């Protein structure tokens, strides 16, 4: 526990943190990667270049300082970060490295004096121990499961299937021929790659896209402009290649009773965690209402449409609606979509009126903000809205 003086000293630095903003974390990362370049093998350097990780870390530091007297308020954020850390296989000793560079950054940017540095050192130590403890629990849980493992495990690509102009699915089975751990629908896999030509090992998280079967895993990857890993997977990865996977993880997952109505709302590749949820609901013969609401640019980039239709036909109460923002002439001729333009949930108000309904959202942050705002305006409680950000977390 932190003493009152330490808490007061840390809270007194909040105005300085806010004034400095992500410049603080930019300095921190530049310093850390200069002194510990081996960490480039763990961190997503694309998120470093676009500034997303710097913003996410700054928000986390500011939130910790603001809630230092009420640590339970931070537990949801801790769980989200701890789950992601296990996908990167973060170890306790790496927290010491981060702590060293955080304190050095505060000193170099602000020269706040030893009392402030000591207070932040104590505060960081408490937070680091919370993460270390929770991550140890997750590692143990993953290793103890039937088909579970520690660290990473080699898997072979057994199928590679184009699903749209931008999205390709990959199926993996373990090289050792053993079973694989189950997961909750909505969770992701950590994919570890360092093909020839990569400057650093790259680790990415991709949502699992079907109900667990104990034999293997399936993900779907969108080819991003300039995306090193996604382009390698699309253009170079082949059936028979071996990749290393960290065990399934993530705090975003569906957990509902058979009589709970569910809405799965997505845009673009954000449908991937929803596919695992829909597959689970279908195979478990979910009895309550299930809605599938999806937005895509057009039919060329709309993946898994046939699979969704097939799964929907097995559910007793299923409603699907698809919006194309800019449908092609072929889309219009074939009528493969329901509405043109942006997603408008007021069109389906009757289908989402049950106050017990749980809503799961995934897609670009702007889309999720747009969809969540509509849901709230239609009377949905915020507590019933669950969402996943691909990349560093953002608050809707």
Curated annotation (Swiss-Prot):
Amino acids binding FAD = 188, 204-207, 389-392
The record describes how the cofactor is bound as: Binds 1 heme b (iron(II)-protoporphyrin IX) group per subunit. Binds 1 FAD per subunit.
> Which residues make up the annotated site Involved in heme-bound ligand stabilization and O-O bond activation?
29
For this protein, what is any one GO molecular function term?
metal ion binding
Q: What is its EC number?
A: 1.14.12.17
What is catalysed by this protein?
2 nitric oxide + NADPH + 2 O2 = 2 nitrate + NADP(+) + H(+); 2 nitric oxide + NADH + 2 O2 = 2 nitrate + NAD(+) + H(+)
Q: Which residues form the active site?
A: 95 (charge relay system), 135 (charge relay system)
**What does the entry list as the binding residues for NADP(+)?**
268-273
> Does the entry feature the keyword Cell inner membrane, yes or no?
no
Q: Which residues form the Globin domain?
A: 1-136
The annotated region (Reductase) lies at 147-396
Q: Where is this site: Influences the redox potential of the prosthetic heme and FAD groups?
A: 84, 388
Task: Name the Pfam families on file.
Answer: FAD_binding_6, Globin, NAD_binding_1
Domain FAD-binding FR-type residues, every copy? 150-255
Q: What is known of its domains?
A: Consists of two distinct domains; an N-terminal heme-containing oxygen-binding domain and a C-terminal reductase domain with binding sites for FAD and NAD(P)H.
Role played: Is involved in NO detoxification in an aerobic process, termed nitric oxide dioxygenase (NOD) reaction that utilizes O(2) and NAD(P)H to convert NO to nitrate, which protects the bacterium from various noxious nitrogen compounds. Therefore, plays a central role in the inducible response to nitrosative stress.
By sequence similarity, the record places it as follows: Belongs to the globin family. Two-domain flavohemoproteins subfamily. In the C-terminal section; belongs to the flavoprotein pyridine nucleotide cytochrome reductase family.
Write down the NCBIfam families for this protein, in alphabetical order. Answer: PRK13289.1
Q: What is this protein's record name?
A: Flavohemoprotein
Q: What is the lineage of its organism?
A: Bacteria, Pseudomonadati, Pseudomonadota, Gammaproteobacteria, Enterobacterales
